[in-house]
Amino acid sequence: LNVVNNQWAISTHANLATGGRTFAERGLAYDIPSMRVDGNDFLALYSVTKWARDRAAAGKGATHIEVYTYRAGGHSSSDDPSVYRPDDEFKCWPGGDPILRLKEHLVKAEMWNETRHTALAKKIDDEVMASYKAACEFGDLASGPYPPASTIFTEVYEEVPWHIQEQREELGK
């Protein structure tokens, strides 16, 4: 059971959103082994997740893991975190970027290097761009084609709940 704590519930800091000190301790109230892990440390997160998976596979039940991380950006594209977050808040977050942390660890361990990193970054960028271009062949938000509004009710439920069915019928009026 993973709870990703990025420290913000939209614009409310997690300290104000919970009565406890951590989200991990909530699992203890249900007698579920609970852990808190640095979500920006790939190796720590992998280790804890593997331990919990092995524990579950051995029939020992669930493990509650609080993945403590930092939301560097806004909650959504319409969110302006500068309104409710101090400008220097990110400086208080130890460890920094998880991708950079893992890269630096692997380089120090001589398991990775700048040449491979640059090549992989280019390959990923190329794949993303190719996928984007392929998707644009089906249309985009600027030029369409646009599916009918009624499609918001399709391909979601195997059996449409009554309240959704009512909304669907209301749309047709």
PLM region spans:
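Glycine-rich ThDP/TPP pyrophosphate-binding loop and its adjacent helix/strand module
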Residues: L1-D140
